[in-house]
C-alpha cells in the first residue's frame, strides 16, 4: 500500500462536520458588513514579494521570518499573502479606484504565515478585512469599531471581548518618540532579551508589546507615546473617543498598543478575548494614511481592520455557540421498479416550490429501514417515501422523522405540507 499523504503542518482541512459553523460565521460577517454599504473585493493570494516588504516593513517579524516566498520561472520573487491590506491597496492603485475617490470595501480569504502552529495560530488561516479609502476623520474610525461591535452582538460573543485603543500619532511624532524610547531602552540594556535588543534599533515600538515579564516591568517607566503626539493626532483620537462614548461602546486606552505592521499611524485598536488563552486578539486594525502613497499612489487617507476567522470559530466552539442550520431538511426514500427517477423529480419539485429547502435523495439501494436510518443520521426532519404504488397513484408518503407519524398526500400538495413542518 502506498504511503498516505498528509496535509502540510499548520494547514488544516475544514471537514463537512465543521463547515456549517464556518458558513454561519461567514454569513453573519457578510450580512453585518453589507448593512453598512461596503462592497466586496477579491484579490490574488500571490503577490510580488516587494509589495509586502514595502508595505509591512523590512524589519517586521512577518517579512523577516514568516512569509512563504518563492521564485517563479521568470525569476520573479513571489509571496503567498500574509495579510490583505497591502494587496487591497495595490489593487486599488492599479485599477484607479483610489485617486480623489471614496471606497469602502471588504474581502475574505486565506492568508499564509510560517509560524509555529498552535491553538488559534496556523500557517494557513482565514481573515476578513474591511478597508476605507479617502476619509480622514475619526467618524469613519468609529464606524468600523461600531461595525465590529455589531458583529460580536450578532454572534453572541459581545460579553466575551473587550476593546483596546491607542493613537500612535504621525510619522514625525513617532520618530521623535522612537528616539526617546531607544535612549530609555539603552539605559536598561541588561534587562532586555535578545529579541528586544534586536528590535531596539530596528523596530523599537514592538518592544512595548513584549511578553517578557522582566521587560514589561521596566516599561512602566518608559516614555509615554501620548506625550509625543502631534496636535492633529491628539484631536483625532479625542474625537474618536467622544464618538465611541456617545455610541455606548466601552474601551480601554492602552498606550503600549502599537500593532505589528509598520504602515499604521494615528488610530490603532484591537478586540481581545480571555476565552482563547494566549491567542487573545480576534480583530485588529487602525489608520494607514501613508500606505497608498508609499506604494506608488496619490496621498490617500485610509483605515481598516482584519479579523481572524479561525479564532472566531474557536471562540464560538469554546462558548458552545455552535447552533447551526441542519444540512438536510427532507430525505427522499424510494423502493421498487422505476421509483428512483420519480424520487429525483419529486426532489426537484420541492426545491423549486420552497426556496432554501435542503432535499437529499437516497442512493445505493437498501430497504426502508436502512434508508430511514440514513435519514436520521443526516438530521432530516421529514422523509418522502415513494414506492411503486405511490408512483402509479401520483402520491407520496410524508413521514415526520421525530414523531414517526406518516400521511399520504398528492404530489401536488406535498410542498405546502413540508413547509408547515420545517
Swiss-Prot record:
Q: Does this entry carry the keyword Cytoplasm? A: yes
State which Enzyme Commission number(s) the record gives.
6.1.1.21
Gene Ontology biological process terms from the UniProt entry: histidyl-tRNA aminoacylation
**Top-rank taxon:** Bacteria
Query: Which reaction is recorded as catalysed by this protein?
Result: tRNA(His) + L-histidine + ATP = L-histidyl-tRNA(His) + AMP + diphosphate + H(+)
* InterPro entries in UniProt: aa-tRNA-synth_II (IPR006195), aa-tRNA-synth_II/BPL/LPL (IPR045864), Anticodon-bd (IPR004154), Anticodon-bd_dom_sf (IPR036621), His-tRNA-ligase (IPR015807), HisRS-like_core (IPR041715), HisRS/HisZ (IPR004516), HisRS_anticodon (IPR033656)
Give start-end ranges for the coiled-coil region(s).
none
Q: Where in the cell is it found?
A: Cytoplasm
Cellular component terms per the entry's GO annotation: cytoplasm
Please provide the record's keywords in A-Z order: Aminoacyl-tRNA synthetase, ATP-binding, Cytoplasm, Ligase, Nucleotide-binding, Protein biosynthesis
Indicate where this protein is primarily found: cytoplasm
One GO molecular function term?
Answer: ATP binding
What family is it from? Belongs to the class-II aminoacyl-tRNA synthetase family.
**How is this protein organized at the quaternary level?**
Homodimer.
What is the name attached to this protein's record?
Histidine--tRNA ligase
The taxonomic lineage of its organism, from the top, reads: Bacteria, Pseudomonadati, Pseudomonadota, Gammaproteobacteria, Vibrionales
Gene this protein is translated from: hisS
Amino acid at each position: 500500500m502506498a504511503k498516505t499523504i498528509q496535509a502540510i503542518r499548520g494547514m488544516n482541512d475544514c471537514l463537512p462536520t465543521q463547515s456549517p459553523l464556518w458558513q454561519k460565521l461567514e454569513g453573519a460577517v457578510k450580512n453585518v458588513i453589507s448593512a453598512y454599504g461596503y462592497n466586496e473585493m477579491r484579490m490574488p493570494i500571490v503577490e510580488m514579494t516587494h509589495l509586502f516588504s514595502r508595505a509591512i516593513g523590512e524589519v517586521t517579524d512577518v517579512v523577516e521570518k514568516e512569509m512563504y516566498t518563492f521564485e517563479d520561472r521568470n525569476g520573479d520573487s513571489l509571496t503567498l499573502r500574509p495579510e490583505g491590506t497591502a494587496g487591497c491597496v495595490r489593487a486599488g492603485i492599479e485599477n484607479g479606484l483610489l485617486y480623489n475617490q471614496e471606497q469602502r470595501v471588504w474581502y475574505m480569504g486565506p492568508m499564509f504565515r510560517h509560524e509555529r502552529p498552535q491553538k488559534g495560530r496556523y500557517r494557513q488561516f482565514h481573515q476578513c478585512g474591511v478597508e476605507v479609502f479617502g476619509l480622514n476623520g475619526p467618524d469613519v474610525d468609529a464606524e468600523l469599531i461600531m461595525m465590529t461591535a455589531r458583529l460580536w452582538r450578532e454572534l453572541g460573543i459581545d460579553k466575551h471581548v473587550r476593546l483596546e485603543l491607542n493613537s500612535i500619532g504621525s510619522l514625525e511624532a513617532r520618530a521623535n518618540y522612537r528616539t526617546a524610547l531607544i535612549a530609555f531602552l539603552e539605559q536598561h540594556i541588561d534587562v532586555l532579551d535578545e529579541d528586544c535588543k534586536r528590535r531596539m534599533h530596528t523596530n523599537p515600538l514592538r518592544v512595548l508589546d513584549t511578553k517578557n515579564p522582566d521587560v514589561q516591568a521596566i516599561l512602566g517607566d518608559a516614555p509615554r507615546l501620548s506625550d509625543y503626539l502631534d496636535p492633529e493626532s491628539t484631536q483625532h483620537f479625542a474625537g474618536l473617543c467622544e464618538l465611541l462614548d456617545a455610541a455606548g461602546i466601552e474601551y480601554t486606552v492602552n498606550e503600549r498598543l502599537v500593532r505589528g505592521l509598520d504602515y499604521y499611524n494615528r488610530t490603532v485598536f484591537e478586540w481581545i478575548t480571555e476565552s482563547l488563552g494566549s491567542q487573545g486578539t480576534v480583530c485588529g486594525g487602525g489608520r494607514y494614511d501613508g500606505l497608498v502613497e508609499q506604494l506608488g499612489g496619490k496621498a490617500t487617507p485610509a483605515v481598516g481592520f482584519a479579523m481572524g476567522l479561525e479564532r472566531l470559530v474557536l471562540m464560538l466552539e469554546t462558548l458552545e455557540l455552535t447552533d447551526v442550520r441542519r444540512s438536510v431538511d427532507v430525505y427522499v426514500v424510494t423502493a421498487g421498479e422505476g421509483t428512483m427517477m420519480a424520487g429525483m423529480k419529486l426532489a426537484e419539485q420541492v426545491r423549486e416550490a420552497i426556496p432554501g429547502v435542503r432535499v437529499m435523495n437516497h442512493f445505493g439501494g437498501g430497504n426502508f429501514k436502512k434508508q430511514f436510518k440514513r435519514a436520521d443520521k443526516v438530521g432530516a426532519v421529514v422523509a418522502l417515501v415513494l414506492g411503486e404504488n405511490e408512483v402509479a397513484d401520483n402520491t407520496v408518503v410524508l413521514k415526520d422523522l421525530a414523531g414517526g407519524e406518516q400521511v399520504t398526500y398528492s404530489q401536488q400538495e406535498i410542498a405546502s405540507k413540508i413547509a408547515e413542518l420545517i
